[in-house]
Amino acid sequence: MKRFAVLLLTLALAVCCTLPAFAADTIEVNEDVSVSDDYDWTRFKGQNITLNVYNWGEYISNGSDDSLDVVSAFEDLTGIKVNYTTFDSNESMYAKLKSGAADYDVVIPSDYMVAKMIAEGMLKPLNYDNIPNFQKIDAEYRNPDYDPQNAYTVPYMLCTTGIIYNTTMVDKAPTSWADLWDEQYAGNILMFNNSRDAYAIAAFKSGHDINPQSTEEVDEVVKELKAQKPLVQAYVMDEIFDKMIGGEAAIGVYYSGDAITMIDDNPDLAWVFPEEGSVLSVDCMAIPATSEHQEAAEMFI
Protein backbone atom coordinates (compact mmCIF):
# COMPACT_ATOMS: atom_id res chain seq x y z
CA MET A 1 0.00 0.00 0.00
CA LYS A 2 1.30 3.43 -0.90
CA ARG A 3 -1.48 5.76 -0.03
CA PHE A 4 -1.61 9.29 -1.47
CA ALA A 5 2.04 10.31 -1.68
CA VAL A 6 2.55 13.21 -4.11
CA LEU A 7 -0.16 13.36 -6.75
CA LEU A 8 1.29 13.84 -10.23
CA LEU A 9 -1.85 13.40 -12.25
CA THR A 10 -5.18 15.06 -11.48
CA LEU A 11 -8.01 13.26 -13.23
CA ALA A 12 -10.64 15.23 -15.07
CA LEU A 13 -13.11 13.70 -12.63
CA ALA A 14 -13.14 16.44 -10.02
CA VAL A 15 -15.87 18.62 -8.62
CA CYS A 16 -16.88 21.04 -11.38
CA CYS A 17 -13.64 20.17 -13.15
CA THR A 18 -12.78 22.13 -16.27
CA LEU A 19 -9.92 21.60 -18.69
CA PRO A 20 -9.08 25.15 -19.79
CA ALA A 21 -7.64 24.07 -23.12
CA PHE A 22 -11.08 22.96 -24.35
CA ALA A 23 -14.55 24.37 -24.73
CA ALA A 24 -17.56 22.09 -24.70
CA ASP A 25 -20.83 21.30 -23.01
CA THR A 26 -20.74 20.27 -19.37
CA ILE A 27 -21.67 16.67 -18.51
CA GLU A 28 -23.32 16.24 -15.12
CA VAL A 29 -22.01 12.91 -13.80
CA ASN A 30 -23.71 12.93 -10.40
CA GLU A 31 -24.47 15.44 -7.66
CA ASP A 32 -20.76 15.84 -6.89
CA VAL A 33 -19.11 15.68 -10.29
CA SER A 34 -19.36 17.41 -13.64
CA VAL A 35 -16.93 17.36 -16.54
CA SER A 36 -16.48 20.07 -19.13
CA ASP A 37 -14.24 19.28 -22.11
CA ASP A 38 -14.49 17.94 -25.64
CA TYR A 39 -13.35 14.41 -24.76
CA ASP A 40 -16.03 11.84 -25.65
CA TRP A 41 -16.48 10.19 -22.27
CA THR A 42 -19.69 8.39 -23.24
CA ARG A 43 -18.64 6.56 -26.41
CA PHE A 44 -18.51 3.14 -24.70
CA LYS A 45 -21.92 3.35 -23.02
CA GLY A 46 -24.07 0.33 -23.76
CA GLN A 47 -21.10 -1.84 -24.79
CA ASN A 48 -20.92 -3.78 -21.49
CA ILE A 49 -17.17 -3.23 -21.08
CA THR A 50 -15.51 -4.19 -17.81
CA LEU A 51 -12.03 -2.89 -17.01
CA ASN A 52 -9.90 -4.91 -14.62
CA VAL A 53 -7.74 -2.42 -12.70
CA TYR A 54 -4.91 -3.68 -10.48
CA ASN A 55 -3.48 -1.07 -8.11
CA TRP A 56 -1.69 -0.66 -4.82
CA GLY A 57 -4.07 -0.74 -1.85
CA GLU A 58 -5.88 2.51 -1.02
CA TYR A 59 -4.07 4.29 -3.84
CA ILE A 60 -7.00 6.15 -5.36
CA SER A 61 -9.65 8.42 -3.89
CA ASN A 62 -12.48 6.09 -2.86
CA GLY A 63 -15.14 8.22 -1.18
CA SER A 64 -13.83 7.82 2.36
CA ASP A 65 -13.41 10.87 4.59
CA ASP A 66 -15.64 12.90 2.24
CA SER A 67 -13.30 12.35 -0.71
CA LEU A 68 -14.43 11.77 -4.29
CA ASP A 69 -15.09 8.15 -5.25
CA VAL A 70 -13.14 8.24 -8.51
CA VAL A 71 -13.98 4.71 -9.67
CA SER A 72 -17.71 5.20 -9.09
CA ALA A 73 -17.68 8.58 -10.83
CA PHE A 74 -15.80 7.07 -13.79
CA GLU A 75 -18.40 4.29 -14.05
CA ASP A 76 -21.27 6.81 -13.93
CA LEU A 77 -19.64 9.01 -16.54
CA THR A 78 -18.55 6.37 -19.04
CA GLY A 79 -20.83 3.38 -18.55
CA ILE A 80 -17.71 1.24 -18.13
CA LYS A 81 -17.70 -1.13 -15.16
CA VAL A 82 -14.47 -1.23 -13.15
CA ASN A 83 -13.36 -4.40 -11.39
CA TYR A 84 -10.85 -2.92 -8.96
CA THR A 85 -8.41 -5.15 -7.05
CA THR A 86 -5.19 -4.45 -5.17
CA PHE A 87 -1.68 -5.77 -4.53
CA ASP A 88 0.98 -4.94 -1.93
CA SER A 89 4.23 -5.33 -3.89
CA ASN A 90 5.55 -4.97 -7.42
CA GLU A 91 6.76 -8.54 -7.31
CA SER A 92 3.36 -10.02 -6.51
CA MET A 93 1.76 -7.92 -9.25
CA TYR A 94 4.42 -8.99 -11.75
CA ALA A 95 4.12 -12.67 -10.84
CA LYS A 96 0.35 -12.63 -11.30
CA LEU A 97 0.57 -10.99 -14.72
CA LYS A 98 3.47 -13.17 -15.83
CA SER A 99 1.67 -16.37 -14.86
CA GLY A 100 -1.40 -15.44 -16.89
CA ALA A 101 -3.53 -16.19 -13.84
CA ALA A 102 -5.64 -13.09 -14.45
CA ASP A 103 -6.27 -10.55 -17.19
CA TYR A 104 -5.85 -6.87 -16.34
CA ASP A 105 -6.43 -3.71 -18.33
CA VAL A 106 -4.69 -1.14 -16.10
CA VAL A 107 -1.82 -1.80 -13.70
CA ILE A 108 0.31 0.53 -11.58
CA PRO A 109 3.94 -0.70 -11.43
CA SER A 110 6.85 1.26 -9.96
CA ASP A 111 9.61 2.68 -12.14
CA TYR A 112 12.07 -0.22 -11.91
CA MET A 113 9.30 -2.74 -12.60
CA VAL A 114 8.15 -0.68 -15.58
CA ALA A 115 11.58 -1.12 -17.18
CA LYS A 116 11.45 -4.88 -16.59
CA MET A 117 7.94 -5.23 -17.98
CA ILE A 118 8.79 -3.18 -21.08
CA ALA A 119 11.87 -5.33 -21.73
CA GLU A 120 9.75 -8.47 -21.46
CA GLY A 121 7.03 -7.19 -23.80
CA MET A 122 4.39 -7.10 -21.07
CA LEU A 123 3.01 -3.59 -21.75
CA LYS A 124 1.16 -1.96 -24.65
CA PRO A 125 2.40 1.32 -26.19
CA LEU A 126 0.00 4.12 -25.29
CA ASN A 127 -2.01 6.28 -27.69
CA TYR A 128 -1.89 9.74 -26.16
CA ASP A 129 -4.75 10.95 -28.33
CA ASN A 130 -6.87 9.09 -25.78
CA ILE A 131 -5.05 10.51 -22.74
CA PRO A 132 -5.35 14.31 -23.05
CA ASN A 133 -4.63 14.85 -19.35
CA PHE A 134 -1.03 13.79 -19.95
CA GLN A 135 -0.47 17.45 -20.80
CA LYS A 136 -0.92 18.16 -17.08
CA ILE A 137 2.09 16.06 -16.06
CA ASP A 138 5.03 18.19 -14.92
CA ALA A 139 7.88 18.15 -17.44
CA GLU A 140 10.24 16.89 -14.73
CA TYR A 141 8.44 13.54 -14.76
CA ARG A 142 8.19 13.09 -18.51
CA ASN A 143 10.61 11.09 -20.66
CA PRO A 144 12.14 9.10 -17.77
CA ASP A 145 15.03 6.69 -18.19
CA TYR A 146 12.83 3.73 -17.31
CA ASP A 147 10.34 4.60 -20.11
CA PRO A 148 11.79 6.99 -22.72
CA GLN A 149 9.16 9.33 -24.20
CA ASN A 150 6.60 7.75 -21.84
CA ALA A 151 5.86 5.28 -24.60
CA TYR A 152 4.23 2.82 -22.19
CA THR A 153 3.39 4.62 -18.95
CA VAL A 154 1.89 7.73 -17.36
CA PRO A 155 3.44 8.75 -14.01
CA TYR A 156 0.83 8.65 -11.25
CA MET A 157 2.39 8.99 -7.80
CA LEU A 158 5.75 9.91 -6.30
CA CYS A 159 6.85 8.57 -2.91
CA THR A 160 9.79 8.02 -0.59
CA THR A 161 10.50 5.66 2.30
CA GLY A 162 11.15 6.81 5.84
CA ILE A 163 10.86 5.88 9.51
CA ILE A 164 7.55 5.92 11.35
CA TYR A 165 7.62 5.71 15.14
CA ASN A 166 5.40 5.93 18.20
CA THR A 167 6.33 8.99 20.26
CA THR A 168 5.09 7.31 23.45
CA MET A 169 7.45 4.36 22.92
CA VAL A 170 10.50 6.15 21.47
CA ASP A 171 12.14 8.71 23.77
CA LYS A 172 14.25 10.49 21.17
CA ALA A 173 13.12 11.07 17.61
CA PRO A 174 15.07 8.83 15.21
CA THR A 175 17.32 10.54 12.68
CA SER A 176 19.10 7.67 10.94
CA TRP A 177 18.36 4.32 9.35
CA ALA A 178 20.69 2.93 12.01
CA ASP A 179 17.91 3.52 14.55
CA LEU A 180 16.17 0.48 13.07
CA TRP A 181 19.10 -1.55 14.42
CA ASP A 182 18.92 -0.05 17.94
CA GLU A 183 18.78 -2.87 20.49
CA GLN A 184 16.60 -0.86 22.88
CA TYR A 185 13.75 -1.45 20.41
CA ALA A 186 14.32 -5.21 20.14
CA GLY A 187 11.03 -6.93 19.43
CA ASN A 188 9.39 -3.62 18.55
CA ILE A 189 10.88 -3.00 15.10
CA LEU A 190 8.90 -3.47 11.87
CA MET A 191 10.92 -3.99 8.68
CA PHE A 192 9.90 -4.19 5.02
CA ASN A 193 8.84 -7.59 3.76
CA ASN A 194 10.17 -6.37 0.44
CA SER A 195 13.71 -7.30 -0.54
CA ARG A 196 14.36 -4.25 -2.72
CA ASP A 197 13.38 -1.65 -0.11
CA ALA A 198 14.95 -3.61 2.76
CA TYR A 199 18.24 -3.84 0.86
CA ALA A 200 18.25 -0.10 0.14
CA ILE A 201 17.73 0.73 3.82
CA ALA A 202 20.61 -1.51 4.90
CA ALA A 203 22.79 -0.04 2.15
CA PHE A 204 22.08 3.52 3.32
CA LYS A 205 22.73 2.51 6.92
CA SER A 206 26.12 0.96 6.11
CA GLY A 207 27.26 3.63 3.66
CA HIS A 208 27.03 1.50 0.53
CA ASP A 209 25.60 2.46 -2.83
CA ILE A 210 22.04 1.21 -3.24
CA ASN A 211 23.11 0.01 -6.70
CA PRO A 212 25.90 -2.44 -5.81
CA GLN A 213 28.92 -2.81 -8.05
CA SER A 214 30.17 -6.12 -6.69
CA THR A 215 29.02 -9.27 -4.93
CA GLU A 216 31.19 -8.22 -1.98
CA GLU A 217 29.05 -5.10 -1.51
CA VAL A 218 25.90 -7.20 -1.64
CA ASP A 219 27.31 -9.60 0.95
CA GLU A 220 28.14 -6.74 3.32
CA VAL A 221 24.64 -5.29 3.07
CA VAL A 222 23.07 -8.72 3.58
CA LYS A 223 25.16 -9.07 6.76
CA GLU A 224 23.52 -5.90 8.05
CA LEU A 225 20.07 -7.36 7.42
CA LYS A 226 21.01 -10.62 9.13
CA ALA A 227 22.32 -8.69 12.14
CA GLN A 228 19.01 -6.84 12.37
CA LYS A 229 16.83 -9.96 12.17
CA PRO A 230 16.86 -10.87 15.90
CA LEU A 231 15.60 -7.37 16.72
CA VAL A 232 12.69 -7.42 14.27
CA GLN A 233 9.18 -8.08 15.52
CA ALA A 234 7.83 -8.71 12.02
CA TYR A 235 8.55 -8.19 8.35
CA VAL A 236 5.50 -6.38 7.00
CA MET A 237 3.83 -4.64 4.14
CA ASP A 238 0.22 -3.54 4.69
CA GLU A 239 0.24 -5.23 8.09
CA ILE A 240 2.15 -2.20 9.38
CA PHE A 241 -1.08 -0.20 9.50
CA ASP A 242 -2.73 -2.28 12.20
CA LYS A 243 0.50 -2.69 14.14
CA MET A 244 1.56 0.96 14.23
CA ILE A 245 -1.93 2.42 14.61
CA GLY A 246 -2.69 -0.10 17.35
CA GLY A 247 0.53 0.60 19.28
CA GLU A 248 1.88 -2.92 18.76
CA ALA A 249 5.34 -1.73 17.66
CA ALA A 250 7.59 1.21 18.49
CA ILE A 251 9.31 1.90 15.19
CA GLY A 252 9.15 0.81 11.58
CA VAL A 253 9.68 1.80 7.98
CA TYR A 254 7.17 2.51 5.25
CA TYR A 255 6.13 4.82 2.44
CA SER A 256 5.60 8.54 2.99
CA GLY A 257 1.96 8.72 1.94
CA ASP A 258 1.01 5.74 4.07
CA ALA A 259 2.75 7.33 7.04
CA ILE A 260 0.43 10.33 6.73
CA THR A 261 -2.56 8.00 6.88
CA MET A 262 -1.25 6.20 9.96
CA ILE A 263 -0.54 9.50 11.72
CA ASP A 264 -4.09 10.66 10.94
CA ASP A 265 -5.40 7.53 12.65
CA ASN A 266 -3.03 7.69 15.63
CA PRO A 267 -1.68 11.14 16.63
CA ASP A 268 1.03 9.49 18.76
CA LEU A 269 2.82 8.51 15.55
CA ALA A 270 5.41 10.60 13.70
CA TRP A 271 7.50 10.17 10.54
CA VAL A 272 11.07 11.20 9.74
CA PHE A 273 13.21 11.32 6.62
CA PRO A 274 16.57 9.78 7.62
CA GLU A 275 19.72 11.86 7.35
CA GLU A 276 21.39 9.37 4.99
CA GLY A 277 18.70 9.97 2.39
CA SER A 278 16.10 7.66 0.93
CA VAL A 279 14.81 6.10 -2.25
CA LEU A 280 12.51 8.13 -4.48
CA SER A 281 10.14 6.09 -6.64
CA VAL A 282 7.50 6.85 -9.24
CA ASP A 283 4.46 4.62 -9.68
CA CYS A 284 2.93 4.61 -13.13
CA MET A 285 -0.28 3.67 -14.91
CA ALA A 286 0.20 1.17 -17.73
CA ILE A 287 -1.78 -1.23 -19.90
CA PRO A 288 -0.75 -4.91 -20.01
CA ALA A 289 -0.06 -6.33 -23.46
CA THR A 290 -2.88 -8.84 -22.94
CA SER A 291 -5.59 -6.20 -22.47
CA GLU A 292 -8.45 -6.34 -24.96
CA HIS A 293 -9.79 -2.91 -24.00
CA GLN A 294 -6.92 -0.53 -24.70
CA GLU A 295 -8.98 2.53 -25.61
CA ALA A 296 -11.23 2.17 -22.57
CA ALA A 297 -8.15 1.62 -20.39
CA GLU A 298 -6.62 4.81 -21.79
CA MET A 299 -9.85 6.59 -20.91
CA PHE A 300 -9.47 5.41 -17.30
CA ILE A 301 -5.84 6.59 -17.22
Map each language-model feature to its residues:
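Early extracytoplasmic/lumenal segment of secretory-pathway proteins
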Residues: 25-116
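Bacterial N-terminal signal peptides
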Residues: 8-16
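Positively charged n-region of N-terminal signal peptides that target proteins for export
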Residues: 1-9
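Extracytoplasmic/periplasmic substrate-recognition and gating elements
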Residues: 258, 264-301
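General small-molecule cofactor/ligand-binding pocket signal
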Residues: 83-85, 233-235, 270-272
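Sec-dependent signal peptide cleavage junction
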Residues: 15-29
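Extracytoplasmic ligand-binding site segments that recognize negatively charged/polar headgroups
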Residues: 52-67, 88, 102-248
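A ligand-binding cleft/hinge motif common to bilobed small-molecule-binding domains
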Residues: 114-116, 245, 251-268
